[in-house]
């Protein structure tokens, strides 16, 4: 009787240990499998590839420049042909015909881009070097009501990075913005959204 | 006694079934894990990424053209700037005269090799870029001088196209090949001395994105 009991106990312990080992193995393998599936999925959904596919429908040529500083191991940055690269964006000036703000944004969208969002003085200086001082250009900024200015790509409106002309904005009913040249400098001017102007399109570079 | 036996038998069967299930689960998971690791490895070792990185050291800009026919879902074919695009290759006409081996070295330093001509259409495309008063090294040579011509990228010569000028090749000592314009046969190949100086044509495969 006494001998029997210890023997049974030992057997139970042994079985439990084996089962624990088996369960742990299965859990480990499951974790590894899920992890590697996630990694594979991330690679498949790699952003540049999707954007490359999208751009294929809008553009027939890309120009890629070697990046000195490697951005997460990407050594090339690309813009469509005839677009100008600056920082991490590409820019295009639409001068084929003037249009309202809505139409201008549509035209940018048809190129896989949006009306320009200006983040800094350097960026504005770069953009304005491409522009004709006699024309006005829609940018991707509008007043959604009560002087609440909003960028088209949801970039937070930063009062310290605004470049309004002196005395602007000056009319509550002028809810769209153009970049134009006044006297000696480029700056922003609020205008009616239905006015017809040129525009500047912007898209993120594609990194390879 | 009989009951005990039956009871023990049932227990053993039950345990075996559970163990079988556990082992099968582990095997399945192992297989899935290995398979997905292999797939991930394939993605990471993707040729375009590696070649893009290599080209980064030779060139400062690329031009990519939208390819109508999608080559395995890759929609863009890229060549370095100033290189000409045709089919699945990029070409650069070198305007410096050099020995054959130096010409090849110069191509290699750009991530390319001397041109290998695979079709008449390719030769026609190339010759449109050339100056009729000059001759250009091809990636074709006969190192042993025994008439066994070989392409520099190991394309089999015997199965490939040939565009020799009439009566060429004509000298065993001329172990390299240039493409040259002669009247009246126009563009064709001529065997030349490897240590004579000619212009050259570099070729590399496009990068598909």
Swiss-Prot record, chain B:
Q: What happens when the gene is disrupted?
A: Deficient mice are healthy, fertile, with normal lymphoid cells, but show reduced survival after intravenous Candida albicans infection. In deficient mice fungal burden is higher in kidneys of mutant and in response to yeast antigen inflammatory cytokines and Th17 cells are reduced.
Respond yes or no to whether keyword GTP-binding is given for this record.
Answer: no
Q: Where are the transmembrane segments?
A: 21-43
Record keywords = Adaptive immunity, Calcium, Cell membrane, Disulfide bond, Glycoprotein, Immunity, Innate immunity, Lectin, Membrane, Metal-binding, Signal-anchor, Transmembrane, Transmembrane helix
Name the domain of life this protein comes from.
Eukaryota
Q: Which PROSITE patterns match?
A: C_TYPE_LECTIN_1, C_TYPE_LECTIN_2
Membrane topology term: Single-pass type II membrane protein
| All residue ranges annotated as the C-type lectin domain in the record | 86-203
Sites where the protein binds Ca(2+) 2: 168, 170, 174, 190-191
Tissue expression: Expressed by the XS52 DC (dendritic cell) line (at protein level). Expressed constitutively by the epidermis, and skin resident DC appear to be the major source of this expression. Expressed in the spleen and thymus. Expression was undetectable in non-DC lines, including macrophage lines (J774 and Raw), T-cell lines (7-17, HDK-1, and D10), B-cell hybridoma (5C5), a keratinocyte line (Pam 212), and a fibroblast line (NS01).
Q: Which GO terms describe its biological process?
A: adaptive immune response; antifungal innate immune response; defense response to fungus; detection of yeast; innate immune response; positive regulation of canonical NF-kappaB signal transduction; positive regulation of cytokine production; positive regulation of intracellular signal transduction
Where along this sequence does the record place binding of Ca(2+) 1?
A: 116, 118, 122, 203
Entry GO MF terms: calcium ion binding; carbohydrate binding; D-mannose binding; pattern recognition receptor activity
What's written under domain? A short stretch of the intracellular domain (AA 8-14) proximal to the transmembrane domain is required for association with Fc receptor gamma chain.
How does it associate, per the subunit comment? Associated with FCER1G. Heterodimer with CLEC4D; this heterodimer forms a pattern recognition receptor (PRR) against fungal infection.
For this entry, the protein name equals C-type lectin domain family 6 member A
């Amino acid at each position: 009787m006494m001998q029997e009991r210890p023997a049974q106990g030992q057997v139970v312990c042994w079985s439990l240990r084996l089962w624990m080992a088996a369960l742990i193995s299965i859990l480990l393998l499951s974790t590894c499998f899920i992890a590697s599936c996630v990694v594979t999925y991330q690679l498949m959904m790699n952003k540049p590839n999707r954007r490359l596919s999208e751009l294929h429908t809008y553009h027939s040529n890309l120009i890629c420049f070697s990046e000195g500083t490697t951005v997460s191991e990407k050594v090339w940055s690309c813009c469509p042909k005839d677009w100008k690269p600056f920082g991490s964006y590409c820019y295009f000036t639409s001068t084929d015909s003037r249009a309202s703000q809505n139409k201008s944004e549509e035209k940018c969208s048809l190129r896989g881009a949006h009306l320009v969002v200006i983040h800094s003085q350097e960026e504005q200086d770069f953009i304005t070097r491409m522009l004709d001082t006699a024309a006005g250009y829609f940018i991707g900024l509008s007043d959604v009501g009560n002087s609440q200015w909003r960028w088209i790509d949801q970039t937070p409106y930063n009062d310290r990075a605004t470049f309004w002309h002196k005395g602007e904005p000056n009319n509550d009913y002028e809810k769209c913005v153009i970049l134009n040249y006044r006297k000696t400098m480029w700056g922003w001017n609020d205008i009616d959204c239905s006015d017809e102007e040129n525009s500047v399109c912007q898209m993120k570079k594609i990194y390879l | 006694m009989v009951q005990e036996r039956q009871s023990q038998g049932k227990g053993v069967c039950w345990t075996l079934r559970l163990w079988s299930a556990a082992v099968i689960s582990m095997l399945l998971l192992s297989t899935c894990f290995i398979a997905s690791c292999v797939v991930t490895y394939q993605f990471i070792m993707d040729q375009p990424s590696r070649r893009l990185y290599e080209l980064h050291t030779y060139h400062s800009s690329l031009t990519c053209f939208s390819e109508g026919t999608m080559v395995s879902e890759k929609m863009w074919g890229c060549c370095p700037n100033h290189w000409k695009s045709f089919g699945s290759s990029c070409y650069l006409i070198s305007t410096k005269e050099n020995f054959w081996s130096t010409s090849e070295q110069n191509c290699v330093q750009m991530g390319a090799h001397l041109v290998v001509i695979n079709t008449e259409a390719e030769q026609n495309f190339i010759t449109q870029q050339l100056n009729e008063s000059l001759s250009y090294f091809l990636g074709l040579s006969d190192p042993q001088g025994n008439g066994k011509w070989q392409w520099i990228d190991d394309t089999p010569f015997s199965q490939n196209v040939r565009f020799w000028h009439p009566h060429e090749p004509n000298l065993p000592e001329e172990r390299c090949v240039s493409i040259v314009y002669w009247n009246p046969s126009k563009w064709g190949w001529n065997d030349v001395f490897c240590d004579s100086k000619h212009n050259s044509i570099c070729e590399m495969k496009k990068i598909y994105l």
